[in-house]
Amino acid sequence: MATRLLCYTVLCLLGARILNSKVIQTPRYLVKGQGQKAKMRCIPEKGHPVVFWYQQNKNNEFKFLINFQNQEVLQQIDMTEKRFSAECPSNSPCSLEIQSSEAGDSALYLCASSLFGTSDYTFGSGTRLLVIGKA
C-alpha cells in the first residue's frame, strides 16, 4: 500500500512539473504516414534567447539536432539528409519540421531553452511523433 501511494505521489509531482513547464511544446502527440510532413512548435521560456531541439529514440538515446541564439543558428547536425528544417523567428514559436517522414523518425522530440546555453536548461514536455504505413 505504501509503495502504491509513493508511486501515485511521484506521478502527480511529475505531472505537475510538465503542466508548469515554462517551455511549451505543441502538439503533444503527432501521428503521420510515411512521406507526410510533420511540424512541431516550441515557445521557449520568457527571456531565454537560446533554444535547442533534441530527438530521443525508443532506446532513450538523445540526439542533438540544432540550437539557436537570438534567432540565429549556432550549431546543427546535417539535419538528416536535409529532410529536417528548423527556425526560431522573433516573436513567434520556434518550429521543427520534417519534410518527408520516415518510420525511423518516430521518436520524442524535445525543445529546451536556456539563458546562456551552457547550463540550467528548461525542457518542454515533448512531442511524440509516430510515423506509420504509407502516406
Curated annotation (Swiss-Prot):
Entries under Pfam families matching the protein: V-set
Recorded GO CC terms: plasma membrane; T cell receptor complex
Region (D segment): 116-118
Keywords of this entry: Adaptive immunity, Disulfide bond, Immunity, Immunoglobulin domain, Receptor, Signal, T cell receptor
SMART domains: IG
Signal peptide range in chain numbering: 1-20
UniProt cross-references to SUPFAM superfamilies, sorted A to Z: Immunoglobulin (SSF48726)
Disulfide partners: 42-111
PROSITE patterns: IG_LIKE
Region (J segment): 119-135
Gene Ontology annotations of biological process type: adaptive immune response; cell surface receptor signaling pathway
Stretches the record annotates as V segment: 21-115
UniProt miscellaneous comment: This T-cell clone expresses only a single V-beta chain segment although it has three rearrangements in the beta chain family.
Protein name according to UniProt: T-cell receptor beta chain V region 3H.25
